[in-house]
Swiss-Prot record:
Gene that specifies this protein: Atp9a
Residue intervals passing through the bilayer: 70-91, 97-119, 304-325, 333-354, 842-862, 875-893, 924-942, 950-972, 979-999, 1007-1030
Loss of function: phenotype: ATP9A knock down results in muscle weakness, memory impairment and hyperkinetic movement disorders. Abnormal neurite morphology and impaired synaptic transmission are found in the primary motor cortex and hippocampus of knocked-down mice.
Entry's Gene Ontology cellular component terms: early endosome; early endosome membrane; late endosome; late endosome membrane; perinuclear region of cytoplasm; plasma membrane; recycling endosome membrane; trans-Golgi network membrane
Protein name stated in the entry: Probable phospholipid-transporting ATPase IIA
N-acetylthreonine: modified positions: 2
Expression tissues: Found in most tissues except spleen. Also detected in fetal tissues. Expressed in brain.
Source organism, top-level taxon: Eukaryota
Record key words, sorted: Acetylation, ATP-binding, Cell membrane, Endosome, Golgi apparatus, Lipid transport, Magnesium, Membrane, Metal-binding, Nucleotide-binding, Translocase, Transmembrane, Transmembrane helix, Transport
Organism listed in the record: Mus musculus
Amino acid sequence: MTDSIPLQPVRHKKRVDSRPRAGCCEWLRCCGGGEPRPRTVWLGHPEKRDQRYPRNVINNQKYNFFTFLPGVLFSQFRYFFNFYFLLLACSQFVPEMRLGALYTYWVPLGFVLAVTIIREAVEEIRCYVRDKEMNSQVYSRLTSRGTVKVKSSNIQVGDLILVEKNQRVPADMIFLRTSEKNGSCFLRTDQLDGETDWKLRLPVACTQRLPTAADLLQIRSYVYAEEPNIDIHNFLGTFTREDSDPPISESLSIENTLWAGTVIASGTVVGVVLYTGRELRSVMNTSDPRSKIGLFDLEVNCLTKILFGALVVVSLVMVALQHFAGRWYLQIIRFLLLFSNIIPISLRVNLDMGKIVYSWVIRRDSKIPGTVVRSSTIPEQLGRISYLLTDKTGTLTQNEMVFKRLHLGTVAYGLDSMDEVQSHIFSIYTQQSQDPPAQKGPTVTTKVRRTMSSRVHEAVKAIALCHNVTPVYESNGVTDQAEAEKQFEDSCRVYQASSPDEVALVQWTESVGLTLVGRDQSSMQLRTPGDQVLNLTILQVFPFTYESKRMGIIVRDESTGEITFYMKGADVVMAGIVQYNDWLEEECGNMAREGLRVLVVAKKSLTEEQYQDFEARYVQAKLSVHDRSLKVATVIESLEMEMELLCLTGVEDQLQADVRPTLETLRNAGIKVWMLTGDKLETATCTAKNAHLVTRNQDIHVFRLVTNRGEAHLELNAFRRKHDCALVISGDSLEVCLKYYEYEFMELACQCPAVVCCRCAPTQKAQIVRLLQERTGKLTCAVGDGGNDVSMIQESDCGVGVEGKEGKQASLAADFSITQFKHLGRLLMVHGRNSYKRSAALSQFVIHRSLCISTMQAVFSSVFYFASVPLYQGFLIIGYSTIYTMFPVFSLVLDKDVKSEVAMLYPELYKDLLKGRPLSYKTFLIWVLISIYQGSTIMYGALLLFESEFVHIVAISFTSLILTELLMVALTIQTWHWLMTVAELLSLACYIASLVFLHEFIDVYFIATLSFLWKVSVITLVSCLPLYVLKYLRRRFSPPSYSKLTS
């Protein structure tokens, strides 16, 4: 048999706005004071505001009470076919165009609209209840009369709000005071940015020093804040106290903010409200939900357009055969109404209900627990993926970091030699604690050991100090929290940090003798092997950013007064910061090839004068309102020169369970896997080999670093001469290639069995997805677990988020959410395949059902001199596509050609779907021919066998039509489910029972005769038997691939 010609509709923009903001008209936007601009907010005096601000109301509804019905109807009738059916129904009010009872056209349309309206109403009610619950939460507001209770919706800009532990922050605020002794608080931000690690926040120093919270109302102070924007990771502002002499000004940054939607994890805080309502960071980052339109839906739209063309052609032919006699234009309209069943009005409803079933089945699958379907509109996409783009860290790997290597240049310590590191640390502190009497000079061996111990100690101390980790003490049932914190109880201590890498490093320093036991915003405590506590003052902290790829900290040792600047970061940036050495680059490469994540650690000693000079310039830069980030970075960079290289650290991130067999399954299914990661080249390559993304006997072409067009041209030519090899390329080289040779590069890359892109920025990940879609026209699936994967996930045809240690941001942004990468195999091979095949069968059967009755109408009109008279009227035409055939046809969503275990065992079955065979122009044409044959057979058979009255034609043909549909469903089903049997018997019973009430259309006495029974039996047999024979012969002599596995 020849292959089907897959449907290839034009790829439209994949996302369309499915959520019109009907509940918020444009004129309401001006009520909040126009365009957002910087503001001055006086503490505790909302009446002093210099502009109008929006109410602090959360509103996630699409519509309000008045716009609900018009909004829903508009969203439905903007689709051509729904509008077309509305015009048909309205035409029945014109006497010259009426073909029967009004309900014949209005009931089906009303049913479709009722399903949509009910679904939207349920969603709106749920939204309203959630919004009301959030807006009604009660908070404490500080006023001159004391503390008063206020609802979240009544909070205003300038209010002083008190938020307790485990309470949600109701508005965007500046952090003024905390009840915590350490003068800071922790936030849980997982609902804002998806990250599960707690964030440290610091109050304004000036207000934290006030004796009580009530004193906030006694001072004259204000906050100057930037205009509202979507950036949740940055903030610029200043705090000014005017009643002091001289006035005090402090710069404000992200560390002083409490964004709405976050939760206070420690203590009780007081903040001043800056932004409310739609100006909240969380609201501005929440775009209207958008739906992806699946390729399957586009293909079905193509088919319905073909059917509409057929409808017009058939109507014109009927009128033409009448020689356009009389009022022929009215006849055209009547025939358009008569053959309107050619376009099935129930197709969209059936497919949407099918998608709901597929989503329910996915959620209920016990073999992929925790899987969530967030977009129920595209389950069929899972069955046709050609390119899978995956993140590395946390997706292919566990994101559970284990410290593996400490490298000092001349010596390296692995897991098997950590006791030596511990010995060096112990010897340093035991020597310091002893004050031995004068003795003979040390031997050479002793000097060497002391030198090595000193180097190891400096490295471990730097690792123990340079981080953003905070130890948190919790009650363990024996010791309460306060006592545990006071005694630094090991069993009660938990480390909180913004990255698993940070926790792994601090846990390792604890294992070798240097334990982080305490930290607040201004100090840090380390416990030594001799139970001595080292107190260090934190002078400055420079947090890690994706742009800088490094972090630093300046501390003062309280016992010696020494000031030290510690820094750690990626080798690509640290190589230009540390003093010249001849081993850094080589050893970084060696450790990366072992699959380790490498950090370079360095330090620099500062004199008091050097630090004071730096601090003055740094404070001045932080007070700048314009270009603050650039000025601050410039000041910090003045310190980052000629730093002393201390060590390299290697942390391993192990592969997730069953990653290798899952990738092998995907490869055998014809899916090409690309790994896009921000990690370094050597680490990414090593992980690709370990995961068998690149097979053992496969060559790897490492695309060398290129910086201009000429170099890119030469390297592409070199790559072109390679065959069947995996490609490894860095983000910098990728950017150059896409700038000058986008088409050539993508053409070559698409031919590779696997591609690894390292040092890849989030925007580049999304760009690669977009280019694959444009250049190949194939469906893409993006898999990730972190916030840097969100853009890639949203850009892909099908986004899958993995719930991991980096939070839920990717999971919440994805169409599907899984808990482990290995679940992806079953999601695609079983659920994706079944969803696509079931929807293909369902859509073609619904079309077949409509074409059958339309063919019968065409034959009937032709026989009776092309009269525009309906064959079936009233309840018959409505019941045909509802209670008589709806349940058996819809039961096809439960059908499957092979068992789940077989689909997983033979992923090659998935390849057939990539060619679009289940739904193609060929299969569509076959079903059209089947419909024409069966419709003609039934109608001509009824005309030949009826005896005297017209109602006999109706009875014979309609009964034969119902039985034919039921038999066709039975012949199509490949794996019977008990619900399918119930659907068949229930539909037949409904038809037989309803015959008693159909005396207006059917002769009840005639259908009880033997003559009726044998005529219906013969017609049904002639319409179905040849198709069964053809199906049997095809399975016998040209069986499909799946039948070979089930026979």
